Amino acid sequence: MNKQELTELTEFSRGYTKEVWFIHGANATPTSFNYIKESLERDPELNEYKFVDIIYDCQENLKSIISVLARSAPKDKQLYIIGHSLGGVVAVGVSQKIIQFDMPVSLRGVITMSSPFGGSESADYLRWLYPQYHLFRSISTTSRVITDLKSVGAVVPTLSLVTTSGNNPLFSSANDGVVTVASQRALKKSVYVEMPYNHFEVLVSTETVQHIKLFLKKQ
């Protein structure tokens, strides 16, 4: 039996019927979600859930990343997607692609944290100063990914945790130290919950874990 067959057998024996994708932010790694995943794994009511780390390079074309992930979605399990920061943009983009092309995927919902759905005004300028840095083009307010995201909005049940603490003085409006509150609230048809944390504290908050547990068990 090869490694893939052994993995599939183990999954079957454990009775996985649901899969949760964790998509990290720009220049981050799956380590970002360690606290959240460990907390979820201790909940006996979530034994049916398989937790999967999604790794991507934010220097690659974001539209291509979204398309590849949508095509990779499991056909035999209910799917939930959780994303932090840019990972939330990717998560919503994947959900839109799955619904747009009527893919045979049982996508149950999306959870985002501190995500720049409205793009970044800073990136509008930085993309010209650093044209080799693809991330700035991806999250500029006029990028195709951002404009499509805002135009279509949430297409499945979506919970967006909006972080409001941090207040970087370099921004002209309320922000979490990295992303403005306005940008986090730019996704239509999402349910918003404000969290009194900065851009990174949300990842180690017990309140965040409770919101995720409630969402997973409800959908």
Where are these regions (language model features)?
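Short, surface-exposed "cap/lid" segments of acyl-processing enzymes
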Residues: 2-48
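Serine-dependent carboxylesterase/thioesterase catalytic core
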Residues: 20-24, 41, 46-54, 59-156, ...
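Residues that form or flank phosphate/diphosphate-binding pockets in enzymes
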Residues: 31, 60, 203
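Alpha-helical elements of Rossmann-like donor-binding domains used by nucleotide-donor carbohydrate transfer enzymes
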Residues: 35, 39, 64-68, 93, ...
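C-terminal catalytic-base region of ester-bond hydrolases, centering on the histidine
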Residues: 153-219
